[in-house]
A protein has these predicted regions:
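N-terminal module of bacterial RNA polymerase sigma factors
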Residues: 1-29, 170, 174, 181
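Sigma70-family region 2
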Residues: 12-13, 39-40, 50-67
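Amphipathic, Lys/Arg- and hydrophobic-enriched alpha-helical face
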Residues: 23-41, 58, 126, 171, ...
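Structural recognition of an alpha-helix C-terminal capping motif at a helix-to-coil junction
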Residues: 32, 46-53, 66-78
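Hydrophobic positions on the alpha-helical face of helix-turn-helix-like DNA-binding modules
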Residues: 51, 75, 137, 149-151, ...
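Arg/Lys-rich amphipathic alpha helix in sigma70-family domain 2
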Residues: 60-64, 74-95, 115
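DNA-recognition helix of helix-turn-helix
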Residues: 81, 125, 133, 142, ...
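Internal acidic/polar
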Residues: 90-115, 146
Length: 181
């Protein structure tokens, strides 16, 4: 049982501090992951909060069949996709100045994760590739999920995920003009 699942088990047994540990472990990564879908920091934070509320309100849905991180990121993905689907019908195009301000806020959140010029170039390249490639690379390399766990989040087979990661790395290399990531 992974550390997150152990903390969740303690929470279910009445240890309220364990929920704080779970939030501390996964909150920032989950917000960054959801942000890739919704492209709005406030919405990403709200959806991440909804994921943690889901853990409290519906504990029976987890079932300890996968790692807690996989379950949390699957919930995050589902909530983000639902949100984007609903918003695409009603949301006007975002003001560019507002978008820049959000990106500045996001940079503050990411500042301890992303360092240096190479990482900036890498993220620009990641933003330019197909959504499935970007999601696969994010889950495997930034969130450090196994191929099996990441495949579960994306509703793909491990082989399909392996192909997405390979193609994503190739696309990023081509965009960066380098031979290695």
């Amino acid at each position: 049982m992974d550390k997150g699942a152990q903390s969740y088990r303690r929470f279910l047994d009445g240890d309220d501090d364990a929920l704080g540990e779970i939030v501390d472990m996964y909150r920032e990564g989950l917000i960054l992951f959801i942000y890739r879908y919704v492209e709005n920091l406030a919405d990403a934070e709200d959806l991440a909060e909804d994921v943690f509320v889901e853990l409290i309100v519906n504990p029976e849905r987890y079932g300890f069949r996968s790692s807690l991180k996989t379950y949390i990121f699957t919930l995050g993905r589902n909530k983000a996709v639902d949100f984007v689907r609903k918003q695409s019908k009603i949301r006007p195009v975002q003001d560019p100045e507002e978008r820049l301000a959000e990106l500045a806020d996001l940079h503050t959140l990411e500042s301890h994760i992303i360092r240096g010029e190479e990482n900036r170039r890498l993220y620009e390249a990641l933003d330019s590739i197909k959504e499935d490639y970007r999601t696969a690379l994010h889950l495997v390399y930034l969130e450090e999920l196994s191929y099996k766990e990441a495949a579960g989040v994306m509703k793909k087979t491990p082989k399909q995920l392996e192909n997405l990661v390979g193609r994503g790395k190739k696309a990023v290399r081509e965009l960066m003009g380098e031979e290695g990531i």
